[in-house]
From Swiss-Prot:
NCBIfam families the record matches: PRK13240.1
TM ranges: 5-23
Name recorded for this polypeptide: Photosystem II reaction center protein Y
Family label: Belongs to the PsbY family.
Length: 37
């Protein structure tokens, strides 16, 4: 694996994992509201 490729992919992977984390958190919050009502 080329080090330059890792340097380029690193921020993309971090942004993708951050987006997935935020979407997951939002979904859990929505399900929590639905269950409470």
């Amino acid at each position: 694996m080329d080090i330059r490729l890792i340097i380029v992919l690193m921020p993309i992977l971090m942004a993708a994992s951050w987006a997935i984390y935020n979407i997951g958190k939002a979904l859990v919050g929505q399900f929590g509201k639905m269950l409470n009502e």
